[in-house]
Regions:
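A detector for small-residue-rich transmembrane helices and their helix-helix packing motifs
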Residues: 1-203
Length: 203
């Protein structure tokens, strides 16, 4: 894979910063509009099941910029920053943004295959793709679980993937799009493999 490292390492690189800002603005705008009864933004931008009659192709992109509540937004954005700034510095902004969007859209596509859900919102699928990238790029790096227990990134990522699979299969933690999370990781994994085989690709 072609590797890129900027001369100056940034703790808040361009794409990560802009994604944080956009997600916050969309969340606040949605909250204000819904308070006054304007539900159209949610109906049109959240990811709806294909058979619902509400599905629109652009929802595969827009759903990842919407969040159910502040806690949902906070943890997604914290994880995006925590792992994303490292990956963006390592890959460069253009490749990072392309990867992020592919993982988010891929997560949405996988979720469309799962029956029995209403709407899906959130950047979690894309963020899980970023987590997967961190584990593949820096497998021996130690992550402090709950800020206390050190665990290598590769085991951290594998553990999360197993948990998501088990929760998805057993129906644990209903209301969480486990297969979307897995979809983001799968699409990220395939894209990284492609880049490794084609190191001089455009992205």
């Amino acid at each position: 894979m072609a590797q890129y490292s900027p001369q100056r390492f940034s703790m808040l690189p361009t794409v990560v910063k802009n994604l944080l800002i956009i997600n916050l603005i969309v969340f606040l705008a949605t909250m204000v509009l819904e308070k006054y009864g304007f539900l159209l933004i949610t109906n049109m931008c959240a990811l709806n099941p294909i058979g619902s009659g509400r599905f629109r192709i652009w929802q595969l992109l827009t759903y990842m910029f919407m969040h159910a509540n502040f806690e949902h937004l906070f943890f997604n954005m914290f994880a995006l920053w925590m792992f994303g700034y490292v990956i963006e510095n390592f890959w460069g902004s253009r490749r990072f943004l392309f990867y992020y969007l592919v993982c988010g859209v891929g997560a949405g596509l996988c979720n469309l295959l799962v029956p029995g859900w209403d709407i899906t919102v959130g950047a979690s699928g894309a963020v899980y793709g970023i987590l997967l990238a961190f584990g593949m790029m820096f497998p021996e790096e130690r992550i402090y679980l709950y800020f206390l227990v050190p665990i290598k990134a590769k085991w951290f990522v594998i553990g999360y993937a197993v948990i998501e699979l088990l929760c998805g299969v057993t129906g644990t933690a209903a209301g969480v799009a486990h297969f979307a999370h897995l979809g983001g990781m799968i699409f990220g994994f395939l894209l990284i493999l492609y880049w490794r085989k084609h190191p001089f690709s455009k992205f």
